[in-house]
Amino acid sequence: MSRPTSSSESGIEEGLAFQPRFDASGLVTCVATDARTGDVLMVAHMNEEALRRTVETGDAWYYSRSRKALWRKGESSGQVQRVVEMRTDCDQDAVWIKVEQRGAACHTGRRSCFYRAVTRGEGGEARVAFVDADRLFDPADVYHKKS
């Protein structure tokens, strides 16, 4: 990984160097999908250290904005993500990882964090409906707190 320079726009888009562009908070957005099915599992953030550890270990590492801490996916729950492939977008400010997900990806115990569909109600208002919402584990048991 190297830091982009202001004159390397074409290098960012067409070059072979991985030069992630971190935002003002030092983060890039990461989309994690199931390598086998293509289903979106979660969206999280990585700082430089999380990105480096992900590349080095092959396990998904993230940065928690709420806890302001680095964490390895599955550290507490055992629901590990093994990275099969990592891609970056055209301007290298986001990454996409295809993972082998063991168990649930969501801290709510569900396979994916995207377990609710936004639908249009009879009056035209946006509503939420549960889809693919079965829990694979009880968060209270895994994290020892109320869900």
From Swiss-Prot:
Name recorded for this polypeptide: Phosphoribosyl-AMP cyclohydrolase
GO biological process, one term: L-histidine biosynthetic process
Keyword Amino-acid biosynthesis: yes
Source species, domain of life: Bacteria
Cofactor binding mode and count: Binds 1 Mg(2+) ion per subunit. Binds 1 zinc ion per subunit.
The EC number(s) this enzyme carries: 3.5.4.19
Function text: Catalyzes the hydrolysis of the adenine ring of phosphoribosyl-AMP.
Pathway info: Amino-acid biosynthesis; L-histidine biosynthesis; L-histidine from 5-phospho-alpha-D-ribose 1-diphosphate: step 3/9
Pfam families, per database record: PRA-CH (PF01502)
Catalytic activity: 1-(5-phospho-beta-D-ribosyl)-5'-AMP + H2O = 1-(5-phospho-beta-D-ribosyl)-5-[(5-phospho-beta-D-ribosylamino)methylideneamino]imidazole-4-carboxamide
Compartments it resides in: Cytoplasm
UniProt binding sites for Mg(2+): D89, D91, D93
Family matches, as HAMAP family: HisI
Keywords: Amino-acid biosynthesis, Cytoplasm, Histidine biosynthesis, Hydrolase, Magnesium, Metal-binding, Zinc
Family: Belongs to the PRA-CH family.
Any one Gene Ontology cellular component term annotated for this protein: cytoplasm
Main subcellular location of this protein, as a coarse class: cytoplasm
Transmembrane segments: none
